[in-house]
Curated annotation (Swiss-Prot):
GO terms of biological process kind: glycolytic process; tricarboxylic acid cycle
Enzyme Commission code(s) on record: 1.2.4.2
Record bears the keyword Membrane: no
Task performed by this protein: E1 component of the 2-oxoglutarate dehydrogenase (OGDH) complex which catalyzes the decarboxylation of 2-oxoglutarate, the first step in the conversion of 2-oxoglutarate to succinyl-CoA and CO(2).
Required co-factors: thiamine diphosphate
Organism: Brucella suis (strain ATCC 23445 / NCTC 10510)
Source organism phylogeny: Bacteria, Pseudomonadati, Pseudomonadota, Alphaproteobacteria, Hyphomicrobiales
GO cellular component, one term: oxoglutarate dehydrogenase complex
Family: Belongs to the alpha-ketoglutarate dehydrogenase family.
Protein name (database record): 2-oxoglutarate dehydrogenase E1 component
SMART domains according to UniProt: Transket_pyr
InterPro entries: 2-oxogl_dehyd_N, 2oxoglutarate_DH_E1, 2oxoglutarate_DH_E1_bac, DH_E1, KGD_C_sf, ODO-1/KGD_C, THDP-binding, Transketolase-like_Pyr-bd
Summary of subunit composition and partner proteins: Homodimer. Part of the 2-oxoglutarate dehydrogenase (OGDH) complex composed of E1 (2-oxoglutarate dehydrogenase), E2 (dihydrolipoamide succinyltransferase) and E3 (dihydrolipoamide dehydrogenase); the complex contains multiple copies of the three enzymatic components (E1, E2 and E3).
Length: 1004
């Protein structure tokens, strides 16, 4: 027994001896072993013994050194550049490197000992140790210096206890060593430096008014760029006298604006920027520096804090317009309809010019739901980037073309740390289908969330810590040092324009008043507000600094303030009689579109496509390149589709969709379809992107229809609903001529994005005069798949419907699906479309259409007749209208359940009428149809429970219609599942029993 126990011990001993052979040391060991093979005396005696004892052949040692075959190649990323390995803690390598360099210098006579003679071996070793310890200290500052930076203007933040890890003593340096020049190989822009010289640069760079976090970045080029940009004796925060005066001027404007409103509208909510005024010159710098580096457009998104100040001082919105709104006036002309919104939610756009570079700015309108505007801004920016390249591009726009449009997001500290959509947007930032060449995030960190202290609103030291997951550099900066804030904004902009990646500025400031101007903050933060009341404003502090520098006098500052106040007084007077001259919502890309009128007109648009064109598109849909290896199941799918095109019969759901997409692309409308697994389709029905089975190359038939067509993009999104839907909504705001679709994996999961439906899609047009043609495809249908795979909660969307705000449809034929998709682009206005889409109907033998139904004079039908009325070869022949005893109205898949059950029972006096579009409700069309059956009993049948589905919505509408036609039965009877808390049962037996019960109720 004892013998058997020895084996693991021996194995452990061997592992202990050889563990250094694994992973990252492989190259080094290989190199040593190769040297040993050539000449055993060329390596250290310990290594010589080790290699001799191994007695392995060279290949085995090499294999061991390389580690397992599944190890990720090129990872960890190899450090490149001088001494970068030191900064990642590979000290043995550094010591060797420095020793070699010092030996070389000694040999050339460049490095001298204390007596001025060439260095001895002992002195070289000491000098190398000094260098390594100095570099360890430099690394500590780069890693942890931000924790010691002077960031809090109020000085209330506790200093971290880091056990003096930044002190020279920690690295073996005593004051006696302070005069000695140490070789640091240009790490801080110096070849040699004393400890005090190093500390001077390090403290100024990492522990001043700016604290930089960048050592979590794994890309050596990005890391080296930041070091190069901020480290060194000549890299101080420095501005010209003109630059300093410009900063002062912007601060005076920002502070003066808030104070002016405070006097004129005492106690009115404005969510002032008081305490964070440095934001304004920082934003100016972002636009200015960006413009110099090729930036053409900035899409802003921000919360309420400081919004009016940004609108007026950065966006150039006339002050008179803002004062008009404070007075209670509308921001649109009187003849423009809309419910409006509070002034600190409104958007705006303008052009700014710096140094001859014109940059267009647009601020996106947003609700009070914090951070939800972020994905909308990113989507808008993506669409604008795409439009710069053109709609007929033949591939996704490369990343190098995207930096011309910058998404710029302003955040509150508590919201950035608290809202999940922030992490979702960061997750989108690097994905090919959603990247925007880097968003610039600016956190207005007033160190409080309404009344909650940071310790209770986040678990991490900084609000920005969530951004570390995507390795974004983070610049923490003291808001009371405007020059530092502007410098941080400049470097952040340069990083984004250089590397096309997100970057974060975290400006520590404070909120001089309460959460809003009617709030008393001392109830909950007495000490903080005591400090704030005693604290000078940023303008006072910066003014004193410039006076001390002799740049301005107090009289100059007083005059600047008086001039600004006079300008605001003039604007205030003008605001009393101000009239907005036009609504801006149909400018730019939206030119040529109009607002929709009468909700009940047909508004079909010309959606039919000639059969010849459809067949040409269909032919291309089933063609693949000769050398492309298609999966055999997909080949069968393509063969079936080719047969449909040949005969013009049996067009299924996915084929109708591809024909709609293809015909729109040929007509110049780009298609952007996004969502989880949309390339293939959740139910393996779509297959618009084909994969070669031998090399995984992609082929997209829809992008190979004809020259000059618009692009089709199918984007398998990340596993998120909220950010992705918000993003696609934003995209639809910027390009009205692109068909933008978001598909939920199942409709049940769409409520993960409920905020986007409630705050943007259903109400954006009425609140902010912003139209959208976004299509939401929500798979819906009760098939025994349980409570989370049955219901898109149709009732929720219907409850949101009013004032012709959007369309809700539940269509049953591929032809109607084809027309409703094309209708989105073929009218001169835009409305969102919420569609319940099928699952089992995707392959249902009856849910098919013909090419004839997509062409000629065909169009979308809001109501569809009973198939038995027209199809002579159907199983039953219906009675004449006068003999029909009951009309069963329904919507969606349940029609086919009713149809088959009726056929099975041989019933011929029950008429099935489908309501394909539930909103806008087709009242006139229903009056026409139901007039045929005035005498009949009316039933509404649905598969959803009674408290769900369309019943509650449609019941009053149907009652109105029946009264209008003077029907015999003035009330509609309900047939469907009884009310339920959960949408559907998870038991197939129960599902079938419920189905049988309501079919009996409807048809019996």
């Amino acid at each position: 027994m004892a013998k058997q126990e020895q084996a693991p011990d021996r194995a452990n001993d061997v592992f202990a001896l050889t563990s250094f052979l694994y992973g990252g040391n492989a190259d080094y060991i290989e190199e040593l072993y190769a040297k040993y093979e050539d000449d055993p005396n060329s390596v250290d005696p310990q290594w010589r013994d080790f290699f001799a004892k191994l007695g392995d052949n060279a290949d085995d040692v090499k294999k061991n050194a390389e580690g397992p075959s599944w190890t990720r190649k090129n990872w960890p990323i190899a450090a490149n550049g001088e001494l970068v390995s030191a900064l990642d803690g590979n000290w043995a390598e550094v010591e060797k490197h420095v020793t070699d360099k010092l030996k070389g210098k000694a040999a050339k006579g460049e490095a001298k000992g204390a007596a001025g003679t060439p260095l001895t071996a002992e002195e070289i070793t000491q000098a190398a140790r000094d260098s390594v310890r100095a570099i360890m200290m430099i690394r500590a500052y780069r890693m942890r210096g931000h924790l010691h930076a002077n960031l809090d203007p109020l000085g209330l933040a506790e200093k971290p206890n880091d056990y003096n890890e930044l002190e020279p003593e920690n690295y073996g340096f005593t004051p006696a060593d302070y005069n000695r020049k140490i070789f640091i190989d240009n790490v801080l822009g110096l070849e040699y430096a004393t400890v005090p010289e190093m500390l001077d640069i390090l403290k100024r760079t990492y522990c001043g008014a700016i604290g930089v976090e960048f050592m979590h970045i794994s890309d050596p080029a990005e890391k080296a760029w930041i070091q190069e940009r901020i480290e060194g004796p000549d890299k101080k925060v420095a501005f010209t006298p003109e630059g300093k005066k410009a900063i002062l001027s912007k601060l005076i404007e920002a502070e003066g604006f808030e104070q002016f409103i405070d006097v004129k509208y005492k106690g009115t909510k404005r969510f002032g920027l008081d305490g964070g005024e440095s934001l304004i010159p920082a934003l100016e710098q972002i636009v200015k520096r960006g413009g110099q580096m090729g930036l053409k457009e900035v899409v802003l998104g921000m919360a309420h804090r400081g919004r009016l100040n940004v609108l007026s001082q950065v966006m150039g919105k006339p002050h008179r317009a803002i004062f008009h709104e404070f007075k209670g006036g509308s921001y649109t002309p009187d003849d423009v309809e809309g419910s409006g919104d509070v002034k600190y939610h409104l958007g705006a756009s303008s052009d700014r010019e710096f140094d001859g570079n014109k940059v267009h700015l647009s601020l996106t309108a947003n609700p009070s739901h914090l951070e939800i505007v972020n994905p909308v801004v990113m989507g808008k920016a993506r669409a604008k980037q795409d439009l710069l390249v053109g709609r007929t591009r033949d591939d996704m726009v490369p990343l190098s073309e995207r930096p011309k449009v910058l998404p710029l997001l302003l955040h509150g500290d508590a919201a950035f740390a608290g809202q999940g959509v922030v992490a979702e947007c960061l997750g989108l930032s690097g994905l090919k289908g959603h990247r925007v060449a880097g968003t610039l995030h600016f956190i207005i960190n007033n160190q409080i969330g309404f009344t909650t202290n940071p310790a209770f609103s986040r678990s991490s030291p900084y609000p920005s810590d969530v951004a570390k997951m995507i390795e974004a550099p983070i610049f923490h900066v003291n808001g009371d040092d405007p020059e530092a804030v502007v410098f941080a904004a400049k470097v952040a902009t340069e990083f984004r324009m250089t590397f096309h990646k997100p970057v974060v500025i975290d400006m520590f400031c404070y909120r001089r008043f309460g959460h809003n101007e009617g709030d008393e903050p001392s109830f909950t933060q007495p000490l903080m507000y005591k400090a704030i009341r005693a604290h000078k404003t940023t303008v006072q502090l910066y003014g004193e600094k410039l006076i001390a520098e002799g740049l301005v006098t107090q009289d100059d500052i007083d005059r600047m303030k008086a001039d600004w106040r006079q300008k605001l007084e003039g604007e205030f007077e003008a605001g009393q009689s101000y009239k907005p001259n036009k609504a801006d919502w149909l400018d730019g890309a939206w030119a040529g579109l109009r607002t929709a009128d009468n909700a009940d007109e047909q508004r079909r648009g010309k959606t039919a496509v000639p059969v010849k064109t459809l067949k040409e598109i269909g032919k291309k849909l089933v063609e693949v390149p000769k050398d492309f290896h298609v999966h055999r199941t997909i080949q069968r799918f393509l063969d079936n589709r080719a047969k449909m095109m040949e005969t013009g019969e049996g067009i299924d759901w996915a084929t109708a969709e591809s024909l709609a997409f293809g015909s729109l692309a040929v007509e110049g409308h780009p298609i952007r379809l996004s969502g989880q697994d949309v390339e293939r389709g959740t139910f393996s029905q779509r297959h618009t992107v084909l994969y070669d089975q031998e090399n995984q190359n992609r082929y997209i038939p829809l992008n190979n229809l004809q020259k000059g067509q618009a692009i089709y993009e199918a984007i398998n999104s990340m596993l998120s609903e909220e950010a992705v839907l918000g993003y696609e909504y934003g995209y639809s705001l910027s390009d009205p001529r692109a068909l933008v679709l978001w598909e939920a994996q199942f409709g049940d999961f769409a409520n993960g994005a409920q905020v986007v439906f409630d705050q943007f899609i259903s109400s954006g047009e009425r609140k902010w005069l912003r139209m959208s043609g976004l299509v939401c495809l929500l798979p819906h249908g009760f098939e025994g798949q349980g409570p989370e795979h049955s219901s898109a909660r149709l009732e929720r969307y219907l409850q949101l419907c009013a004032e012709d705000n959007m369309q809700v449809a539940n269509v049953t034929t591929p032809a109607n699906y084809f027309h409703i998709l094309r209708r989105q682009m073929k009218r001169d206005f835009r409305k969102p479309l919420i569609m319940m889409t099928p699952k089992s109907l995707l392959r249902h033998k009856r849910a098919i259409s013909t090419l004839a139904e997509l062409s000629g004079e065909s169009s979308f039908h809001r109501l569809l007749w009973d198939d038995a009325q027209y199809n002579k070869d159907e199983g039953i022949k219906l009675q004449k209208d006068a003999k029909i005893r009951r009309v069963v109205l329904c919507s969606g898949k349940v029609y086919y359940d009713l149809y088959e059950e009726r056929e099975k029972r041989g019933i011929d006096d029950v008429y099935l009428l489908r309501v394909e579009q539930l909103y806008p409700f087709p009242a006139k069309a229903l009056i026409n149809e139901l007039s045929r059956f005035r005498h009949a009993e009316m039933v509404w049948c649905q598969e959803e429970p009674k408290n769900m589905g369309a019943w509650s919505f449609i019941d009053p509408y149907l009652e109105w219609v029946l009264a209008h036609i003077d029907a015999k039965h003035q009330r509609v009877r309900y047939a469907g599942r009884p009310a339920a808390a959960s949408p559907a049962t998870g038991l197939m037996s129960k599902h079938l029993a419920q189905l049988a019960a309501f079919l009996e109720d409807a048809l019996g």
